[in-house]
C-alpha cells in the first residue's frame, strides 16, 4: 500500500523534444507527463532550462520572458513569465477532463517576449490515470427470474459495473459467489466495456429451491485493486411451455451520424407459438442497459421498432451496444434476449473550428501591437480543428485583410499571424483581419472569424514647429505682461507622447537672463513680455523655444528660434553735446574783426533713437531778427552773415532749436550767448573758454590725456633721433684748411666711377621754384668768425640776386618747353645752363607782351636747394654754392666769362635756326612745339656730354635708397657728326647759319639790363675766409628727398658740368684760379634784387622796373651789365 501511494504522489515528468523544421519562429515541441490529482503548485518543467539551446541564439537571452497561450478558460497549468516554469494551477481530474478516453492531455503554446525575436514552443502535458475509482453497479440488488424449465447453458445478461478509470485501473473482471447452479462469463463490448452473463449450469427445480441470492463482484487491476459488488436475486418460476424467440441473436446496424431523430434503426420481430396472453410479446431494453443508451434510443414495446431518440455524434461515440429482450404476457414468462450493435458512420457534418489566441487579455477579438516593431512581430496564434475524420477533418486556413500581415503554419493545425512590414500608427492605427478555415469534405464546410489589430503608440515623433525661425515685431515702451505672439508645435503621438510643453532655453542679453525679458505659457506656447522694451537698449531679442513631449521612457524635443525686433518710437529728445552747456546755455565768443561767413560754432547733438527719429535739424528761432547769423539746418554750423565790424551790438542771445523728424517731433532748445571780444581780451576769453570746457565729460578728458601722452612720446623720439644724428655727424664735419693741408699727404684717389643712379635731375615744367632767404649761423671758436659772418651775409645777398636772375630768365621759357632745371642745381650752374641753351638755340625766350600772359609762379629758394643736396660724402668734398664747397675746382662760368660772354647780347636781328618755324600767330597765341623743338645734333654716347651729375656721391635718404651702379670709366663718346659748341664759341655761328638774335632775346636782355643798370655797386673790403661748416645747418640742408628720376641736360651744359665736377681740389681756400678775383662784386644789385617778389610773374617784374624807375636809379650800359654779372657769378662761386 505504501508503494502505491508513493507512486500516486510521484511526479513523473519527461520531455519529448522535437526540433522544428518549419520556421525559425517555431522553436520546439515539448511533451510532459504527469499524474492526475497532483498537488496544486507542483512544478512540471522549467522552460529556461529545457530550451536553453534555443535561447542562446537570441540577442539577449537573459532578458527573454515567456507567456502561455492557454486554450480555454480553465488554467489548469500556469507558466511563470520570468523563467518559464510550468506548474499545476488547479487539481486535475483525469476522469473529469477526458472521461473514458485513453489519451488525455493538456496542450498549450508558449511564446517568448519581446516579440521582435519571437520563439514559439508547443507544450503537451499528458495526464496519467491513477486508480482512484472503484467499479460500481447501478443497482445494489439485481432481480432475475428464470423458468424452472430453462435449459442448461441458458445465458442471461447481467447489469454492468462502471469504472471511470482507464487502463488497468478500469473494470477488469467479474466474479460470482460460489454455487452449483449458476456461473458467469465476462464478455467485452465493441466499445471495450466489459459485462457479465449469467449461465445456467444445472437444471433447475422450483420444488427443490425457488430462489437464489448470489453476490456479483466487479474488480479492476489497479494498484491498489478496487472492486464493487451487487446482489443477484434469482427467482425460479413455474414452467411456461413456450418462450418468445428472436430471429437473430444479434444485429449490427450502420448509423450515419447526421441521421435525424426518429430514424427507424431496426424492426424487431420475436415469435411465440402460444396463444392468448402467453403468445403476446412485449419488447424492452434489458435491465442492465446504461442510461446513456436509454437516452439515445427508443424501442416500441409492442411492435419492437428501435428508433433514434437523440442524434448521435461520431466524434463522441463511435458505436453503441444495446441489449433488447422480448417477453410474453403469460405467467412465469421467460424473456428472450437479443444484442444490437449500432456503428455510427462519420459524415462531414462539422465545420472547422477556429480558435484565435491573442496576447490581449480580456478581449478575444482585439490584438495589440506597438508601432515600429520589426517584421515578423507576433500578432496572434490561430488553432483550427475539425471533429470530422478523414478528408472531412483536413483543414485549409487562410488570412484575408492587409498585406502588412501574414499567416505562417507551425505544426498540425496551428498557425501564427505575424507582421509583414513595419507599422506606423500615425499612418494607420487599426487593421481588420479575417481568418478562413475550410475542410476538404464534400461538400466543403468553412468557418470565418474576424478580429482587429490595433497599433499601440510609441513616442517616435518629436514635436514639430511649422518654421525653424519665427520673426515678430513689437513696439518699444510696451506694457509689462503684454502678449507678443504664439508659437505652436504639433506632435502626432497619442496621450502623453503627444502632450507638448514649451520652455525658453536659458540665454543672456546684456548680462540679464532671457527669462527676465519674455516668458512663455508652457501649455499653449503663448509668449508674453515681462518688461518694458527699449529700442535704444536692445533693438532685437533672439531666444530659443523648446517644445518637449511627455513621452516615456525618453522625452523628445525640438527647438525653434524666435526673433523679436523692437520697433523704435520717437521717445528720446535730442541731447546737445557741444558746445558745453550750463543751465542749457552756452557762451560763444566772436572776434571783433570777423568777416561775413566766419564760423561761429557748431551745435553737436545726438538722438538715441534710430532712423528718421534720429535725423536732426537745427534752426534759430529767436535772437536773430536782423539775420546777423545763419545756421546750416543739417550740420548745425552757425556762421556770421555780416561783418562784425558793421554790427553795433556786442552781445546776442540766440535761441536754437534742435528737433528730430519723428512723429511726433521732439526737440531741444539751447541758448547761445554770443559776445564780441577784442584781440586784447583774447586771454580773458580763452580763460572763460577754458572754464566752460571744464564741464567736458570724462570721455573727452581721457581722449585729451591720451593725446598729450602721445605728443610727449613723439617729442622725446624726435629729440632722441636728432641727438643721435648730431653725434653721427661729428665725425663727418669738414674743414677746408684741415682738408687741404692733409690732402697732399694722402695718395691720389682713383677717379670715381659714375653710376646711373647718381645722375638725378628733376625737370621743372612751368613749375614754381620757391625763393626764400636762408640764414645760416654757426658758432665757431675760430678767430675768423666775424669775417665769416660778413661773408655769409654777402653771400646771401649775392645768392638772392642770382636767383632773381634765374627767375627772370625762367619766366621767358615757353609753357610747352620742358626746362631742365632742378632744385639741386646751384644758381650759378642754372644761369650757365640758361645761357648755354639760349646760345645753342634749344629754347627761345617767350615774347614779353601783354596779350599772351600766363599765370605762372616760379619759386626758387637757395635754402631749399640744400634739401636736395647730394653733398657730404664723408670725404670732405662738397657741392658748389655751399659754404664748404671746394674752391679749387674749375668752374665753367670762368670759361663762359673768358670766352666771350658778351656775345650773348649781340642783338642784330638775326633769327636762329630754331625759330624758323615761328609765325605771327606765335606772338598772339604763343609758340607751338614746332617752334621750340628744332632739329638737334645727334646725342653723344658719352654720358658726360649729355648728363649733369650734381655730386660724386648720393647720400642715403630715409625714404629712398639708390644703390650704386657702376658705369664703365672708359666709355668712349660717339661721334656726333657735329662740332661741339662750348662757351668759347658761344654766339659765334658760321657764316652760313642764320642770325641768332631775335626780338625775344632782345626783350630778355633788355629787361636784365634795365634791372642791373639801376643798381649801384657797393664796396666790400675783403673776402671772408672759408669757415667750418655748421653741422646743424648741414643737417637741415639734407632734409629734402632726392628726386627719383634722372633727366639728361642739353649737350653743351652737360659737357662743362661733367668736366668741372670731377676735378680734384688742388688749391687752398682762396679764389679759384682763372677767376677775376680783383673785381669786387657790386652790391648795388642786392637791394634791387631783394625787391623782386618770390612769386615772380611778368606783371610783377614790370612793377619792379617801374618802381626802380621811380627811384631814379642810374642806368647801366650792356658792357657794365656784363661786368656786373661776372662779379655776381664770382661772388657766388667763391661763397
Curated annotation (Swiss-Prot):
Output this protein's name. Answer: Protocadherin-18
Domain Cadherin, chain residue ranges per copy: 28-137, 138-246, 247-354, 361-465, 466-576, 582-688
Provide the assembly information: Interacts with DAB1.
> Which regions face the Cytoplasmic side of the membrane?
721-1135
Chief location category = membrane
Which purpose does this protein serve, as stated in its record?
Potential calcium-dependent cell-adhesion protein.
Q: Which organism is it from?
A: Homo sapiens (Human)
Q: What phylogenetic lineage does the species belong to?
A: Eukaryota, Metazoa, Chordata, Craniata, Vertebrata
Renumbered to this chain, the Polar residues biased-composition regions fall at 791-800
Q: Which Pfam families does the protein's record reference? A: Cadherin (PF00028), Cadherin_2 (PF08266)
Give the domain of life.
Answer: Eukaryota
